[in-house]
Amino acid sequence: MTQAQIQPVKLGTQGFEVSKLGFGCMGLTGAYNDPLQEQDGISVIKYAFSKGITFFDTADVYGANANELLVGKALKQLPREKIQIATKFGIASRGFPDMKIEGSPEYVRSCCETGLKRLDVEYIDLYYQHRVDTSVPIEETVGELKKLVEEGKVKYIGLSEASPDTIRRAHAIHPITAVQIEWSLWTRDIEEEIVPLCRELGIGIVPYSPLGRGFFGGKGVVENVPTNSSLKAHPRFQAENLDKNKNIYERIEGLAKKHQATPAQLALAWVLQQGEDVVPIPGTTKIKNLDQNIGALAVKLSEKDLREIFEAVPIGDVAGGRYYNGLDHFSWKYANTPPKDSKIST
């Protein structure tokens, strides 16, 4: 397959330009696999940039702050003005089966200040609310983000796993540039409400886990899930469900051969070609996987191809929920906030 060129695209309608394929940095400090050594993690980021990826995604909670620090160190070896850094705030603690979500104005500002220090930058290109605090009116959270934009500390604002009502209300306070949300061949529940709303409002869509948390790359099928991986607790990777889901992988594998692509490339190409406003952020710790992901840009799919791939993964055939057990209430479907001028006491 010919080497794919990564074109710049506009994310949202405020002028934010990013590479059509982004890179999710979470796994570099450990999540589905062991964390990489610091220099190895920096090398992966630098390699991605050398191949044309300029849009890098991190968060304060990844690796308990280590991820932002790692990205910041990599940035020191790259031209800052050519890179777009997205980071996130909002998950105050990451317990299991519960997380503490915080969206007060004071918390927003505190996280931004510490994020700037960890990344060692003067501004954050895209700052997301990682999860919605359902006890704080979204107008208060976004109101503080708007101030950070006015102060030059943040360039663009995003939301992650936000409900339609929350997106609309947030956008009325300050333009939302991007919504980051799970979207892949086996997670398509955003297509009825979230995608049309984002397009109505001119908001870009940043799919996370576009390869189904590695499933379409063969994780759990052609390679074992590491014993210390968080995927061990994920419903779709549980033994009985995984056995059923292997049928889905085999179908995509068959279609991939027709397109001279790997299953991962076909699955990622399907996401990439959902629209110009769609910028997925697959992550990996391996250079060969990164090269494969970039190769997905060279897989050209017709409307008929896209439909055939879509129909090869009937959502009713997917065994297991998309969210870890006990964490469903943190998904976009439950991410409404109280009316403005009211708060839920906690």
UniProtKB/Swiss-Prot annotation:
Alphabetical list of InterPro entries matching this protein: Aldo-Keto_reductase, NADP_OxRdtase_dom, NADP_OxRdtase_dom_sf
Active-site residues, as the UniProt record annotates them: 62
GO MF terms, alphabetically ordered: aldo-keto reductase (NADPH) activity
Highest taxon of source: Eukaryota
UniProt-listed Enzyme Commission number(s): 1.1.1.-
Class of the enzyme per the UniProt entry, highest EC level: oxidoreductase
Tissue localization of expression: Expressed in roots. Detected in leaves, stems and mature nodules.
GO cellular component terms attached to this protein's record: cytoplasm
Keyword entries, A-Z: NADP, Oxidoreductase
Residue numbers binding NADP(+): 209-218
Keyword Oxidoreductase part of the UniProt annotation: yes
Triggers of expression: Not induced by auxin. Up-regulated in leaves by ethylene and salt stress. Down-regulated by abscisic acid.
Residues the entry annotates as binding substrate: 130
Function (record text): May interfere with the nodulation process and inhibits nodule development.
Similarity comment: Belongs to the aldo/keto reductase 13 family.
Protein's name according to its UniProt entry: Probable aldo-keto reductase 1
Native organism: Glycine max (Soybean)
Gene responsible for this protein: AKR1
